[in-house]
Swiss-Prot record:
Belongs to the inorganic carbon transporter (TC 9.A.2) DabA family. InterPro entries: DabA (IPR018752). HAMAP family: DabA. The lineage of its organism: Bacteria, Pseudomonadati, Myxococcota, Polyangia, Polyangiales. It comes from Sorangium cellulosum (strain So ce56) (Polyangium cellulosum (strain So ce56)). This is Probable inorganic carbon transporter subunit DabA 2.
Length: 1018
């Protein structure tokens, strides 16, 4: 935000300045679109121009949100070994890299900070400390968490000191010091409080001075009276927004929506629909006086002036008002600037009109609370000054000069192993210096350093694993003569499926690429009502593809049945909501609905199978094919042009070149898209393919395979140096990441010579998906402890159709790494389904041009997913959506808690519970010079990398050396000397473990049947 004294467009009218201000302030609002097309993004996109930790501090102040895990969580990680001493030392080394250490007396700055990170050093009020001393003997015993070294030093040195001072020993005996520990504690406490110390001073300005800076009148009244004025206006305001923005829930549309939010609101009030409550008395008269033609901007400006907010403070005040309901305000802002998110005929969206309505209602609520709770009946412009006079000063909790700071010194001395003999001689200046160092490392600074240590531990584990894997013979990691090649999305959930598929045979090869496979399209499936863009959200598809039946006769019968069934279901649903038919239908349908309800609740998997069988009977599946409405040429239609042969060849070539698959083709090459299907899950789109705009990637895979099989395309590819053998056939497919179902498309088009291999491929994929389901089940708390792969597969299938299941799958939870390079870097390495695997061959890209394209797509996409999970994990109430349990779908836009709340943006608790919030470690197989040159050319990448939103490491393809980007330069990484564990298969490493599992070498042996796998199940 700008400084409070700043203005926008100083020479313009106030209304125009307010418009310009809203353009700026709108960036602080959530950018999440409608929940049906959920696309992951950096929650703090407005702060991305700042270094990571600075951005977190700024956002924490603005949103009142947590930037890191809590200190208690970090200390639990220290206790479990997730953060060790080496990690803390590494974090401190980074902190003091450019600042020399300082020592005063027996302690240095780095020693004090090390102790503050390892152990909690508490503060206490005077009353609290007195109670602890009297009731718990806090100063008569040493800390229970004191390590043995400092503990024994304190006892030994204190006894020596007392031996030379009999009078001191006698005094301690009178105080209760009858054993070495109590004598050491009492003597140390006397020494710590022996020199008077000045108390710390609070620095935060009074709340009344912050109105218009980072607080509003609502905050002021809430703090003074305990009553929140927003509770009076939120219910009618949320109902108004829900009705105005509704995209299909309401049976009757709100009137006058086409005129804009403010005029529609005014019309409702003047027609007698004024918000309920005596506090809104006079609202209809005010709106009538405003007139129908008064611009909303003028209404908002008048409201701000009525509130007494000076223009130089508009920005801070308006920001605070918009952040009262950030979800709704953010949705309005997104619709205003991204109208393509909305269906045709949707009403106009304007953040300015939102503000005008909000301020209009807010003034009535503020007057009411001020009158009832403060007895103030004057103009709102004088409310702040009245509050200044009326409110008692809020004093900080009393702190004792004789207790609080000496008590912290008492704790610090214990942890450092400093006895009375070393503390007593310290001057007041030395004591204050030590305490100021301790106080300077406040809670936020400690959490920042502990977070760095937390990330360091993970970073070393991953880079050590990759370095150890590279030391294996290349023949163990490379596939010389592939039988099957399967290209999957770079999605971290695909890492496990790829690993299990490769463990089945050394001739199984997998690759990774963005799941739209380089073919952005507008797609309409056979049963779809409209088109959907299957491509990244920043790409506008120029081509339209539709799914059509191969036989029109059967398709027409199916279509007619589907329409009749839809009309019947709609009539029943609508009828239950009407007075006349509802009386008859509701009891009857209610009785019969108990049968499917019991089935879906108690036997979800069996019920789902029965329902699918019924649907197949009612609506038989028909064979289909992909078709462009303009295949005869490039004439533009409603959906864009057809793909020409040269465009097809260019798309296929680009995708194959990015993956490094330009030679050594297998007889069968599969492009496997992915998506997720589950029930009772408003966030289902968040589980789908982000590269396809939050939708399924199967159509893209199917289209790419058809292009790659085209003879004319292959002829043009040969001219480009990509010679696909005649014996190679491409297949498209779809992987349901919830159920592990894998469907291959158009296998009937394969030559007869490939039918046997296709059957073998299906068997291998079937075995891999069972093993992958088994690995996934170890992270589900509700999954039985001992499952065979077949049972595990049945379990994940049941989760997808269970109405009560809040976690059908875990999505991208646990994502932490992106590896861009050849599969040889990670083949045979257990990476715990935490890695985005992007195929790239540096030997085929001497200029780095291909890598630049890969980084521009994978970098921001991976960072967006990673950072959304990060922020939803560290503060699920502010940055996330909270628990799913009270969620209700609102206007087909998002979810609310219960019937009336803000739109909950971010990810729900059930998607992030097991996530480790670490920034993405991006490992790129390239030289540091190439990476630096790309960053210099690409501002978007430079912002992410130089500001630390992602962590970059380069693996030199010539030397195998790893270098990490830190503090603006690359520094060599030296892996630990300890060997990496080695096992025969993934199951042997993860069996019996439900948490995160570090990397290990998988020396795959010939495939064994699933029955034998079951014998080793955890």
């Amino acid at each position: 935000m700008n400084e409070p004294g700043s203005t926008f467009g100083a020479g313009e009218a106030p209304e125009e300045r307010l418009r310009a201000l809203l353009q700026h302030v709108g960036h602080f609002l959530p950018a999440q679109g409608p929940i049906g097309v959920f696309v992951h993004h950096n929650t703090l996109h407005a702060f991305q121009h700042l270094p990571f930790h600075d951005a977190l501090a700024a956002a924490s102040a603005l949103f009142e949100a947590e930037p890191y895990l809590s200190e208690a969580e970090f200390r639990a990680h220290i206790a479990s070994g997730r953060i060790d001493d080496q990690d803390i030392e590494a974090a401190l080394a980074e902190r003091f890299a450019e600042t020399p250490d300082e020592r005063r007396g027996p302690l240095s700055r780095i020693e004090i900070e090390r102790l503050a990170l390892r152990f909690p050093i508490e503060t206490a009020t005077q009353a609290g400390l007195g109670w602890r001393i009297a009731e718990t003997g806090a100063t008569r015993e040493l800390r229970p968490d004191l390590p043995s070294g400092p503990y024994h030093r304190l006892l030994v040195y204190t006894e020596r000191w007392l031996a030379e001072r009999p009078h001191a020993a006698a005094r301690l005996l009178d105080q209760g010091g009858r054993d070495p520990e109590s004598r050491a504690a009492l003597a140390l406490w006397d020494a710590c409080r022996g020199v008077p110390l000045p108390p710390t001073e609070p620095a935060e300005p009074p709340l009344v001075d912050r109105v218009g800076v980072d607080r509003s009148h609502r905050d002021l009244l809430l703090a003074i009276t305990g009553e929140d004025p927003a509770e009076l206006i939120d219910p009618p305001f949320i109902r108004l927004l829900g009705a105005y923005l509704d995209e299909g829930v309401a049976h009757w549309a709100m009137p006058d929506r086409a005129q804009g939010l403010f005029r529609a609101f005014r019309g409702l009030v003047l027609e007698g629909s004024r918000p309920a409550g005596a506090h809104f008395a006079g609202l209809d008269a005010e709106l009538r006086a405003i007139g129908a033609n008064m611009p909303p901007a003028a209404v908002a400006v008048a409201a701000l002036r009525d509130l007494g907010v000076a223009e130089q403070r508009w920005e801070g005040y308006v920001t605070r008002v918009l952040l009262e309901l950030p979800g709704w305000a953010g949705m309005v802002h997104r619709f205003e600037h991204t109208p393509s998110d909305r269906p045709a005929g949707a009403p106009p969206a304007s953040l300015l009109e939102y503000l005008a309505v909000r301020l209009t209602l807010a003034r009535y609520a503020l007057r009411d609370v001020a009158r009832r709770r403060l007895g103030y009946r004057g103009p709102l412009a004088g409310l702040v000054e009245h509050a200044r006079r009326a409110a008692r000063p809020v004093e900080p909790p009393p702190r004792s000069p004789d207790g609080d700071r000496p008590f912290r010194l008492f704790q610090l001395a214990q942890l450092a192993g400093l006895s009375v003999a070393q503390i007593q001689p310290l001057s007041a200046a030395d004591r204050v210096w030590a305490l100021e160092v301790l106080e300077g490392l406040d809670e936020m600074a400690r959490r920042r350093l502990l977070h760095e240590a937390y990330e360091h531990h993970h970073r070393v584990e991953v880079l050590h694993g990759i370095a150890a894997n590279l030391r294996r013979p290349e023949d163990e990691r490379a596939v010389r003569s592939p039988r099957f090649q399967v290209a999957l999305c770079i999605d971290d959930r695909c890492e496990g499926l790829r690993r299990h598929f490769e463990e089945l045979s050394p001739r199984h090869e997998t690759l990774g690429i963005a799941g739209f496979f380089g073919v952005p399209i507008r797609y309409r499936g056979l049963d779809d009502a409209g088109h959907a863009s299957l491509c990244p959200v920043n790409v506008a598809p120029a081509h339209e593809i539709v799914e059509r039946p191969r036989e029109e006769g059967a398709a027409l019968v199916r279509k007619a049945r589907r329409r009749r069934w839809a009309r019947f279901v709609h009539a029943l649903g609508h009828g239950t909501r009407t007075l006349s038919r509802g009386v008859l239908l509701t009891p009857t349908l209610g009785l019969f609905s108990t049968i499917p309800l019991v089935g879906r609740t108690l036997f979800p998997r069996a019920y789902a199978r029965l329902r699918r069988a019924f649907e197949r009977r009612l609506l038989p599946a028909v064979p289909t094919q992909l078709h462009s409405p303009h295949e005869e040429g490039t004439a533009q239609g409603r959906g864009g042009a057809a793909f020409t042969a040269s465009e097809k060849a260019a798309r296929v070539a680009a995708t194959l070149e990015i993956m490094g698959l330009t030679r050594r083709f297998a007889p069968l090459v599969v492009m496997l898209g992915h998506g997720s299907i589950s029930v009772n899950n408003p966030h289902q789109s968040a589980y789908d393919c982000g590269a396809c705009g939050g939708r399924h990637g199967g159509p893209n895979a199917r289209l790419f395979a058809a292009m790659a099989n085209d003879r004319e395309v292959r002829a043009q590819l040969r001219e480009r140096g990509i010679d696909i053998p005649d014996g190679t056939f491409f297949l498209g497919g779809m992987n349901n990441t919830t159920t592990e179902e894998i469907v291959l498309y158009d296998d009937h088009l394969a030559p007869a010579s490939h039918r046997g291999e296709i059957a073998a491929l299906k068997d291998a994929l079937g075995e891999a998906r069972k093993r992958h389901a088994h690995e996934r089940c170890r992270r589900f708390a509700s999954a039985p402890a001992r499952l065979s792969p077949e049972q595990a597969l049945a379990h994940v299938e049941a989760r997808a159709v269970d109405l009560s299941e809040a976690r059908p799958e875990l999505g991208h939870a646990t994502n932490a790494v992106c590896v861009i390079g050849r599969r040889e870097l990670t083949r045979g390495l257990f990476l715990d389904r935490r890695v985005f695997l992007v195929s790239y061959d540096p030997t085929q890209d001497p200029s780095g041009a291909i890598l630049e394209r890969v980084l521009l797509s994978a970098g921001p996409v991976g960072a967006g997913i990673n950072l959304e999970y990060y922020f939803s994990r560290v503060d699920n109430l502010r940055y996330g959506a909270g628990t799913k349990l009270p969620h209700n779908l609102a206007s087909l836009l998002g979810v609310m808690d219960g019937a009336l709340s803000d739109l909950r943006t971010g990810l729900p608790k059930q998607m992030i519970e097991i996530h480790e919030p670490v920034r993405m470690l991006t490992v790129v197989e390239t030289s540091t010079e190439t990476a630096a040159a790309i960053c210099a050319r690409q501002p978007a990448l430079r912002e992410l990398i130089h500001n630390g939103w992602i962590q970059l490491a380069c693996l030199d393809p010539a030397t195998g050396q790893i270098a990490r980007f830190t503090r603006g330069a690359f520094a060599p990484f030296t892996p630990p000397e300890r060997p990496l564990p080695e096992v025969a298969r993934s199951l042997d490493w993860y069996a019996g473990k439900s948490g995160f599992v570090p990397p290990a070498i998988i020396r795959a042996t010939p495939s064994r049947p699933s029955l034998e796998i079951a014998d080793h199940a955890a």
